[in-house]
A protein has these predicted regions:
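Metal-dependent active-site segment of extracytoplasmic phospho-/sulfohydrolases and closely related
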Residues: 1-13, 85, 120, 140
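Short, surface-exposed, charged loop/turn segments at secondary-structure junctions
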Residues: 10-18, 99-105
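Glycine-centered secondary-structure boundary/capping sites
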Residues: 8, 18-20, 141, 145
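Active-site neighborhoods of enzymes that stabilize oxyanions during catalysis
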Residues: 25-148
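Acidic, His- and aromatic-enriched active-site or binding-groove loops in soluble protein domains
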Residues: 16-28
Length: 151
């Protein structure tokens, strides 16, 4: 659970590099195994990247505003990217900034994906039960703060 076997890979960096845009001037991208994050310096860059990656030959889609909200990243001020292109289950970005070669299995697909289920176990009663991935940071932070108070 949490890892899915890889069925294929796509070179998103090559696809975006062919759009006649200047990296650092028109856009910045970060290519991870299951997604690509984009920060745009102008609307034209956004339109070109979105048009290219919306082609069915790229097995994925851009995360919607509603999805960002449900994932707890809608008010991030662009920290996670202006756009996130998330690949479909079983596909990966290769090469990525994590690895030059494809992996046999990858984690980090959509939280709704059947293979991305998880469990939460604790040896003590938590201050609150995490509902999203972002909640785990808050839970760990509250635990550290409590430990520091006890010193």
């Amino acid at each position: 659970v949490g890892m899915l076997p890889c069925l294929g890979s796509v070179d998103l960096k090559k696809a975006v590099s062919g759009l006649n845009l200047k990296y650092g001037k028109d856009y910045v991208a970060f290519y991870e195994p299951t997604m690509a994050r984009f920060w745009y310096m102008n609307e034209s860059s956004r339109e070109k990247v979105r048009a290219e990656l919306s082609n069915p030959k790229y097995p994925g889609s851009f995360i919607s505003g509603a999805q960002k909200s449900s994932y707890g990243i809608s008010h991030d001020g662009g920290k996670f990217g202006d756009d996130i292109f998330l690949l479909n289950d079983g596909f990966q970005v290769s090469p990525s900034y994590i690895s030059r070669k494809p992996f046999k299995a990858v984690c980090g697909y959509s939280p709704e994906s059947e293979g991305m289920s998880a469990s939460f176990l604790s040896t003590c009663k938590p201050v609150f039960i995490p509902k999203t991935v972002a909640d785990f940071f808050k839970l760990m932070k509250s635990d550290v703060e409590e430990s520091v108070r006890d010193l």
